[in-house]
A protein has these predicted regions:
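A short, conserved alpha-helix within the catalytic core of class I
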Residues: 127-133
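A short acidic, Gly/Pro-enriched loop at the edge of an enzyme's catalytic core
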Residues: 108-118
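Residues lining the SAM
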Residues: 121-125
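Class I SAM-dependent methyltransferase SAM/SAH-binding core
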Residues: 52-107
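Conserved class I S-adenosyl-L-methionine
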Residues: 1-48, 62
Length: 133
């Protein structure tokens, strides 16, 4: 597989971009482009997240930072972008997250217990190809 497009899709998430990510994505993009307010996504996240959760394509980690129950037993992060992993793992350090750097389009050889819930918020638009592919 050509890794170039996958790497390009995540490369935009620099520390500088992550500093305005929540404002742009959650405040502007969700409301005006996708017509799906962040509060709707937050409500769905709250309904579906479990205390044994894997978040894939974590972005800024917004939903993890603000909507994880304090009783969460296990949280794991999977992303190709180290900036996102560093920022989010630091922000939710009190949960002692498992952190995995990897490409979702490549086989992942993680020798870990299963998760009860997995979220992929804002991941699909970063993957190479188009809807027909």
């Amino acid at each position: 597989m050509n890794k170039g497009p996958t790497v390009a899709g995540q490369a935009v998430y620099s520390k500088k971009v992550l500093s305005i990510y929540d404002f742009w994505v959650l405040g502007v993009s969700n409301n005006f482009f996708w017509k799906c307010p962040t509060r709707n996504i937050s409500e769905q996240f709250l309904m579906l997240v479990t205390s044994n959760h894997l978040d894939v394509g974590i972005g800024s980690g917004y939903y993890l930072k603000y909507y994880l129950s304090q009783s969460t037993k296990r949280i794991a992060l999977l992303d190709l972008n180290q900036n996102s992993l560093d920022a989010t793992s630091k922000a939710i350090n009190h949960f002692q997250p498992e952190v995995y750097c990897g490409d979702v389009l490549e086989p992942l050889e993680l020798n870990v217990d299963r998760f009860d819930s997995i979220s992929v918020n804002y991941l699909l638009h970063c993957l190479p190809g188009n809807l027909i592919d």
